[in-house]
Amino acid sequence: MSEKAEAIGSSSAFGRLLGLEILKAEGGEAILSLKMHDGLRNLHGKLHGGALFSLIDTAMGQASHSLGDGSPNSVTLECKVNYIRPVTDGELICRAWVVHGGRRTQVLEAEVHQGEKLVAKAQSTFACL
């Protein structure tokens, strides 16, 4: 991961609030982790869907930015998430990758796993700036 990408990802106050950690961001792929904590729970004691979406969106953004020099060069236009199973505790790993990198738009996909279990799957379109 480039130093610039690492600085961008780790300087987000929202990412720090959630506890996101960038493990990799290079070549159109990113891997982020999130450890479940009480601040991320919904009324049912499970991981809030908004926190899971934020993990996915951030991973996709890092994958997109990694195609260049790591600086923010795109924004999310739309994103569809399939929430597959609830999360009560533990660590999540999100892997995001660029499926199509055009001049004006990019299509990305992501999967979130807890161990071997698939937690969520997503697809999005980004606009290139």
For each feature predicted by the language model, list its residue ranges:
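Terminal targeting signals and extreme-terminal segments of soluble enzymes
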Residues: 1-129
